[in-house]
């Protein structure tokens, strides 16, 4: 069954442990943790987060790395040694994910337009990272991001065909809208390869709104998602300017959870 959750990134720049605590006190039981600095990958710090999850009977679906902005330079440049270094660095993330019980690692990827990117290199580098993740019990996933190569659905379809089972995707609704892509078309194209979703609403008041504040047919979307990827986590990911306080964020999480469970 689909599972509703909230990203700690919604409360940025509140530090991650306080954001997680706020979500816990608000009744959120499933989260994505956004790591914002290297010190937050230290085993003792991650243990603090893990104890907090255990204390409130919460689960962590996924981890978002703070190094997403340097992925083009580290993972997809022509300087091969950087790739080796970045793969080694990702062991910090994957070890933290084991401590947290998280399975999904979110990758933004390169920023070269899809029309001019070296696709063979891209897919080979992604596969190397995916294989490393698998050795830790982690799924490395490609998120669609408007400013990145992954903005393009045709590129993601090529990635799916090239990588097969190792092609796993995070579908971000607001990023699809910003890219001029139809979220439903992305869902239907990538199908069961979608293992994680960042959800929000959109309409005339913005492209990253709380659910129910825009025109996104999220009930229909959730129904289609459940049919092709029933074990997916659906994570509410909003910007801090998009809601008034934690109570409003928690209420939107409850709305999402109820819709997934068929309640009104």
Regions found by a protein language model. Give the residues of each.
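Active-site beta-loop-alpha junctions enriched in small/polar residues
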Residues: 7-11, 34-38, 65-68, 110-112, ...
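Distinct, well-ordered alpha-helical segments
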Residues: 15-20, 46, 50, 116-124, ...
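Acidic/histidine-rich catalytic cores of soluble enzymes
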Residues: 30-31, 63, 128-215
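Short acidic/polar active-site loop segments enriched in Thr and Asp
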Residues: 29, 103, 195, 232
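Active-site acidic/histidine proton-transfer and metal-coordination neighborhood
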Residues: 17, 72-168
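Conserved, mostly hydrophobic/aromatic
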Residues: 23, 31, 53, 97, ...
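N-terminal pre-domain/capping segments
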Residues: 1-94, 98, 134, 168, ...
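A short acidic, helix-capping loop that chelates divalent metal ions and anchors anionic groups
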Residues: 69-76, 111-117, 178-180, 204-209, ...
